[in-house]
Amino acid sequence: MMTNQRIRIRLKAYDHKLLDQSTSEIVMTAKKTGARVAGPIPLPTKIHRYTVLRSPHVDKKSREQFEIRVHKRLIDILEPTQQTVDSLMKLDLSAGVDVEIKL
């Protein structure tokens, strides 16, 4: 591949432990094939909060709150080789991690 090209990988997950495990797998795979790696860079965590009434029709003051957190990481692979791309394509990551790749 060209030397000035880079691969940007964005990872999203609800579980931060699963996300960190996946990022370490990607970084180790890229380093084994001779590419330079920048990251993982933690991006801001999105927190979605939902407030619902506890009772079906009375007690407006009684409410329950739920939240879900979306953790994100960014990895830049600088100067990737063809072997790097092949090994990243074969990499099997967890089902709870969303991977977005940009060239």
UniProtKB/Swiss-Prot annotation:
This is Small ribosomal subunit protein uS10. NCBIfam families: PRK00596.1 (NF001861), rpsJ_bact (TIGR01049). GO terms for biological process: translation. Part of the 30S ribosomal subunit. Involved in the binding of tRNA to the ribosomes. It comes from the Bacteria. GO terms for cellular component: ribonucleoprotein complex; ribosome. The keyword Oxidoreductase does not apply.
